[in-house]
Amino acid sequence: MGAFPPPIDPSYIPSVSLTRLPATAPTADIIATLERDGALILVDLVSPQDVAAINAEIEPYIQKARAESHEAYDLIPKQTIMVPGVVGKSPTMARMAELDVIDTLRTRVLQRKCTATWEDRTEDFSIDPLLNSSLTYHISYGGPRQRLHRDDMIHGIYHRGGEYRLSDETMLGFMIAGSKTTRENGATMAIPGSHKWDHARVPRVDEVCFAEMEPGSALVFLGTVYHGAGHNSVPDQVRKIYGLFFIPGTLRPEENQFLAIPRSKVLGMSDKMLSLLGYKKPGTWLGIVNNGDPAENLAEVLGMANS
């Protein structure tokens, strides 16, 4: 993809900002903001104790990781450490993926409710969301900013413009701050309202604002929103972000969850997490093994797969 773009001029003053809502805000208010802006900041989503636990649980993997060890992501600079499969490495992060507010929002945005028509009847069913990826974005000093992009490009989504419908969205992300994030140390850039743009509309850096957050708050955004990690210009500071991204259960996850999460860990996970990882059959026949739901006897199914 070539060299990374230059930093945004420090004199630039955003003309827009991200709405901030408490994590305890009514779901209707959060959804209304997502529909309007495509992104917002949920304040105090994760407690200080849980942030500290996540940082401690992930630190050994950060120490082992090579900053440039993300060959599949050419839009990520080498100064960013990406630890993949975080829900399999941090029990606290796995628990965060099941927080009520996260569960409610991903269900509201990404659950697919469908009707099948048979020759003699109709049948309603639902397909629950899947975990698309869980990873770190730890940007060290000197890390350049990313190009502005949309995350839903991984599924080849084409944006036709016209009337906007939240039900058409194919990704919902939660970027949880593990440290104080500022414009200067690489806070994520985002363009509110860009989720409604058509495919031909090109983003400009004079349209961005910055997701500055205290530890435990989270940037929540749709896959249609233009965004990108910022430039870290602060010596001796690391911008720590933990990402949880979800997609409809009808799409293929970016991260291969069947291989990314150790099977020994999978067997101890909750039913909700098994569903998010794709081990549990939804309302249709997706994901069946031996003509049945693998989650009903997962140890036996995994044993068979390992034989």
From Swiss-Prot:
Alphabetical list of PANTHER family matching this protein: PHYTANOYL-COA DIOXYGENASE DOMAIN CONTAINING 1, PHYTANOYL-COA DIOXYGENASE FAMILY PROTEIN
Positions contributing to Fe cation binding: H149, D151, H227
Reported consequences of knocking out the gene: Abolishes the production of swainsonine but still produces the 1,2-dihydroxyindolizine epimers intermediates.
Keywords assigned by UniProt, alphabetized: Dioxygenase, Iron, Metal-binding, Oxidoreductase
Stated name of the protein: Dioxygenase swnH1
Keyword Metal-binding attributed: yes
EC code: 1.14.11.-
Pfam families reported in the protein's UniProt record: PhyH (PF05721)
InterPro entries membership: Phytyl_CoA_dOase-like (IPR008775)
Subunit structure: Homodimer.
Presence of keyword Metal-binding: yes
Pathway given in the UniProt record: Mycotoxin biosynthesis
Listed cofactors: Fe cation
The protein's role, per its UniProt record: Dioxygenase; part of the gene cluster that mediates the biosynthesis of swainsonine (SW), a cytotoxic fungal alkaloid and a potential cancer therapy drug. Swainsonine production occurs via a multibranched pathway and is dispensable for fungal colonization of plants and infection of insect hosts. The first step of swainsonine biosynthesis is the production of the precursor pipecolic acid (PA) via conversion of L-lysine (Lys) to 1-piperideine-6-carboxylate (P6C) by the aminotransferase swnA, the latter being further reduced to PA by the reductase swnR.
Family in the record: Belongs to the PhyH family.
MF terms in GO: dioxygenase activity; metal ion binding
